[in-house]
């Protein structure tokens, strides 16, 4: 475990070690597939951001069985951070993938319904500003490109931005290529997330099996 990082993702693991491990496994798995190298950055940002919301004292206390309020939930704020970090072409898919990485991806427009998502991030924003912003800036420094976590929190605290995102999801149309990309990166994130905790490495077969194996099976 990296001694300079105090925030944890799991009781015995630092947040930094976990998300960088997930990133490395997902990218290694993707490289093995030898498809779409142009989405490397998309995969990397999704993996690095997927547990951002664990960087609150609410979640840290939850790991110690000392807190169980809604503020411990890391999915929604992590999804918003992913949206903020990604370029426009990947914002919506990244949001969906991260928001549902502990569940199932539903209809995109349903993911932003007011009655299904807690959009009140004020307590989490204040908590990060007061307690963990320095470490989060350190963790994400490579990816912020001159920005900082405070800029994200200020953006998140602006209600007009949240309304705009909801409107975008209601209007956006998706095609089959979007669906396949979403499912593919979602599967890489889940693979990386589980493999990092179990074996801390990607599972890469010793050899590639010929296509005839699949055709004969079918």
Model-derived features: where do they sit?
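Accessory nucleic-acid engagement/destabilization modules that flank
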Residues: 3-11, 15-217
């Amino acid at each position: 475990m990296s001694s300079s990082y105090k925030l944890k993702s799991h009781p015995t693991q630092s947040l930094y070690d976990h998300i960088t491990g997930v990133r490395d496994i997902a990218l290694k798995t993707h490289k093995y597939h030898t498809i779409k190298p142009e989405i490397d950055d998309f995969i990397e940002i999704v993996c690095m951001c997927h547990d951002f919301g664990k960087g609150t004292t609410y979640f840290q206390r939850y790991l110690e069985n000392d807190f169980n309020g809604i503020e411990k939930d890391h999915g929604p704020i992590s999804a918003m951070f992913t949206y903020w970090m990604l370029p426009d072409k990947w914002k919506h898919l990244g949001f969906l993938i991260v928001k549902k990485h502990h569940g199932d991806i539903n209809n995109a427009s349903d993911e932003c319904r007011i009655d299904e998502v807690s959009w009140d991030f004020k307590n989490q924003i204040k908590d990060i500003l007061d307690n963990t912003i320095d470490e989060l800036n350190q963790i994400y420094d490579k990816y912020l490109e001159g920005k900082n976590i405070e800029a994200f929190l200020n953006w998140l605290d602006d209600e007009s931005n949240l309304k705009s995102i909801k409107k975008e999801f209601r209007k956006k149309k998706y095609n089959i290529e979007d669906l396949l990309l979403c499912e593919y990166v979602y599967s890489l994130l889940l693979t990386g997330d589980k493999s990092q905790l179990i074996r801390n490495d990607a599972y890469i077969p010793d050899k590639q099996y010929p296509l005839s194996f699949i055709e004969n099976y079918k």
